[in-house]
């Protein structure tokens, strides 16, 4: 009913719903999208955290996507946390190198989605979040930003900037 009402108010506005409705069905490397609202929405949208909540960034190299619904796709969230100025190996969580590596691998992976029409990295700037208590890393901040809370660009910012600059 909400989609119907929205279309009566503004028939030009596209409708989507960001869902995490994907699974590995029959294969550990094929992620299948299931969208219970597919018959209602104009855009398929889902959050994607392979390499952050699901394994390490190199896991992205193995993944392909199965999307049988013929609609445009927008990745509504993806990313990883990094504390500005914390450096180390690219496989060490919370370092700028880890976040940078995750962005590199994620962008290569999602570019293989035929219907991909847009992405929304999570998130541009670190922000206060009381549910982020990890001492000396989070300290009450969501650190998934590409820019630190004091305005400094993290390494992953430049990966995304380069990605956009190379798009036609």
Language model segments and positions:
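Non-catalytic beta-sheet/beta-sandwich ligand-binding modules that flank or precede catalytic cores
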Residues: 29
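Substrate-binding clefts and catalytic carboxylate motifs of secreted carbohydrate-active enzymes
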Residues: 2-26, 34-168
